[in-house]
Amino acid sequence: MELERIVSSALFAFVQTHLPEADLSGLDEVIFSYVLGVLEDLGPSGPSEENFDMEAFIEMMEAYVPGFAHIHRGIIEDMVQTLSVQLSSARNKETLRRPEKLKEESRPPAATGNTQDEAAAAEEEQPGVDVLLEVFPTCSMEQAQWVLAKARGNLEEAVQMLIEGKEEGPPGWGGPNQDLPRRLRGPRKEELKSFILQKYMMVDRAEDQKTHRPMAPKEAPKKLIRYIDNQVVSTKGERFKDVRNPETEEMKATYINLKPARKYRFH
C-alpha cells in the first residue's frame, strides 16, 4: 500500500505539472500496479535500455492519460529514475522494519513482581473500557470502569451517560462533564431550550391571523336550457333528444324496401 501510494502521488504530480488540462480520471489502481510492477526490479540504478522498455511504458501511459506521449522523452526518463529510487528506498525501509517487529513480538515479557497483578487486572478489565478511553481521552480508567459498570456493560449507554453527564461517578469525582472537552459535553439546558424555541416555535404574524375570504363572482353563471321550436326539449330528465329533419317526397321515392315478399300457401 505504501509503494502504491508513492507511485500514485508521483504520477499525479507529474501529469499535473506537464499536462495541466489532462483528464486524471484514467489514473486508477490498474495503472499504479503496472508502474509498480515495471519499476519494482529496477533498483536504485534506474531504467536502462536492457531492463526497461521506454516505448512500451509511454504507450501504456498514453492509453490512460491522453497526451502523455507529447511529453519530452528525457523528462519521462528523469521521472522514472526518481520514482525507481524512491521505491527502492521505501522497500529497504520496509525490509528493515520487519525484523524489528518480529523481535518485539518474540520478546518475552519483563519479569517483575507486579506482572501477575497486572495480568489479573487486565483480565478483570471490561472490554469496553478501552473504547471509552479512546473516545474520551481526558476520562480516567476509574471513571470509565465506573460508568461502564453502571451501564451494565452496555457500551452505547455508557457513552451516552458520559456525554449527557447523567452519571455522578465514584466519590471524589466532580462529574463526567468536568474533565470532558467542550465539544463532548452535552449542551446546557438553557442553550438547548433557546435553540429549540428559536428553530421550531410558531411565528405569530398578522398574515396568520387573517381569515381568507375569496371574492364572490360579479355575475352568476346563467342556467343553460335548450329549446326547440320554443319548447323545452324534454321534461323527463333526458339529456339528449333525437331530432330528425323532415324528408321530402322525392327523397322517400328513392328508398327501396328490402323486405322479402310474403309467401302465400294455397290449401
Curated annotation (Swiss-Prot):
Keywords: Cytoplasm, Nucleus, Ubl conjugation pathway. GO terms for biological process: negative regulation of cytokine production involved in inflammatory response; negative regulation of macrophage cytokine production. One of its GO terms (molecular function) is ubiquitin binding. Disulfide bonds: none annotated. It comes from the Eukaryota. Its main location: cytoplasm. Residues 90-125 are annotated as: Disordered. GO terms for cellular component: cytoplasm; nucleus. Residues 91-107 have a biased composition (Basic and acidic residues). Signal peptide: none annotated. Residues 124-167 form the CUE domain. InterPro entries: CUE, CUE_CUED2. It is found in: Cytoplasm; Nucleus. The CUE domain mediates interaction with PGR and ESR1. Belongs to the CUEDC2 family. Interacts with PGR and ESR1. PANTHER family: CUE DOMAIN CONTAINING 2 (PTHR12493), CUE DOMAIN-CONTAINING PROTEIN 2 (PTHR12493:SF0). Controls PGR and ESR1 protein levels through their targeting for ubiquitination and subsequent proteasomal degradation. This is CUE domain-containing protein 2. It comes from Rattus norvegicus.
